[in-house]
Amino acid sequence: MATSAIQQSAFAGQTALKSQNELVRKIGSFGGGRATMRRTVKSAPQSIWYGEDRPKYLGPFSEQTPSYLTGEFPGDYGWDTAGLSADPETFARNRELEVIHCRWAMLGALGCVFPEILSKNGVTFGEAVWFKAGSQIFSEGGLDYLGNPNLIHAQSILAIWAAQVVLMGFVEGYRVGGGPLGEGLDKIYPGGAFDPLGLADDPEAFAELKVKEIKNGRLAMFSMFGFFVQAIVTGKGPIENLYDHVADPVANNAWAFATNFVPGK
C-alpha cells in the first residue's frame, strides 16, 4: 500500500511534461540545455545488447521485430506482441515503471530470503518469515529491527506507514523532479548523489550495467511472484520451502502442491 502511494504521488503532476526519453529521441537535450542527454546505443557502440544485431527473444527464430524497437534501450529483445511500446510517451512511462519496479523487486527478494538465512544460522528474530514479520507490530512487545529493541522499535502501523511515505516519497520525488541529475543522465538513471560509486562514469560499462539491472530485475519480479504463491500455498517462507524440497523433492515440488492445493485450507 505504501509503495503504491509513493509511486502515485511521485508521478502526480508529471503528465504536463514530455517524457525525457522521448526528448532524447527527438532533440537530445532536456530542461533548456541544463543536462545533455545521452542515447544508450551511442554510449556503448560495441555492446552486443544494443542495436539491430542484439539478441532477440526467440534467438534466430524470432520474427520481424516492430520498427519502434530499435535496440536503443537496455532489455529490448524485440518482443511486443501487445503493442505496448508503440506510443513513444506510453513506452517511456512504462519503461520507467519497469526499472523502478525491478529495483523494488530486487530489494524485496533480498528482504524475503536474508532474514530467513540469518535465522537458520542462529540470529534471533521475532519472526523471520517475510509475510509474517509485519504482524509482529501488533504484538504486545511491538516489532524490533533484527530482534534488537535497542535498534528500531515499532509499535504503530500508522507511524511506519507515514514514515515510509514521507521518507521514501521525498527521495522518489527528488529523483522524478530531476535534480540534480548527473551529467548526461536522466531521471531513470539520475546519477549525481544517487551514484556515489561513480558507476555511470564509463559509458560502455554503464550501458552493460543497465542491461544487467533490467535482466536481474525481471527475474526478481518473477521471484517475488513465486514467493507470494509459495506463501499462499504452503504457508512457509522461500528458504524453508527450499529446505523441504531438498529433503524430499518428490513430495515437495510445484507439481505436487498444484495438484493437492485446496484454497482456504
Swiss-Prot record:
Modification after translation: Photoregulated by reversible phosphorylation of its threonine residues.
Q: Name one GO biological process term.
A: photosynthesis, light harvesting
Q: Give the binding site residues for chlorophyll a 4.
A: 216
The membrane-topology field of this record reads: Multi-pass membrane protein
Where is chlorophyll a 1 bound in this sequence?
79, 85, 98, 218
Q: Does the keyword Protein biosynthesis apply?
A: no
Where is this protein's transit peptide? 1-37
Annotated positions binding chlorophyll a 3: 136, 146, 213
Tell me which residues bind chlorophyll b 4. 164, 175
Residue numbers binding chlorophyll b 1: 57
**Phosphothreonine PTM sites in chain numbering:** 40
Where is chlorophyll b 2 bound in this sequence? Answer: 103, 152, 181
Give the stretches traversing the membrane. Answer: 99-119, 151-171, 219-239
Q: Which domain of life is it from?
A: Eukaryota
Instruction: Name the positions where chlorophyll a 5 binds.
Output: 212, 230
Residues bearing the modification N2-acetylarginine: 38
Miscellaneous comment: There are at least 16 genes for the major CAB protein which can be classified into at least 5 small multigene families.
Protein name, UniProt field: Chlorophyll a-b binding protein 37, chloroplastic
- Protein source organism: Petunia sp. (Petunia)
Q: What is the lineage of its organism?
A: Eukaryota, Viridiplantae, Streptophyta, Embryophyta, Tracheophyta
This protein's gene is called CAB37
